[in-house]
């Protein structure tokens, strides 16, 4: 008789694709690998990943692992949560459009709906996610699992809340300004002073020694961003002339 694993996850839509997984040593390795990658996703990453799963409808655990390694192939627009906001975003991004033409096309909702009809994609609590023209790479072919940190660049994960500590959100750092704004919008706050930090987790243990004092999430993100950029610059190869 084959044992079966029932997977629970905070990732939207994931459970229905991993509801019953036949247990084997290989499957447990794959589940453990996926669990590590999910561990370093924040609230927005989870929403995007769940949306990608819903759009792509993976058939196997291998497919889901490959999706987790191809997240950069999907387009995420933080804060774009309605057809109206999508239409506004698309027009703002087209700086070459004449003012008269923009005025004629100022039906933002219609523009957003037309775009979705042509390109697909779905809205979620934090924004809009759609596919791209790039082909997905088969990073995992069923034999050797890829690097668990493949294309995951966060250094810290912060838990924040407003009001009830059990109703918390997570944010991985460094984060872009648009991603931070999308989280504030989802939390219903205008600035970071309106929320409190519940916990912080460090991906690389040695970074605990580096972590300086900070007065806000925004300041911490600036410090982490600067530190990561400095590390990247030191790792860049020097070309000999």
Model-found features: residue ranges?
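Extracellular/secreted glycoprotein ectodomains characterized by long, lumenal stretches
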Residues: 24, 43, 59-62, 97-98, ...
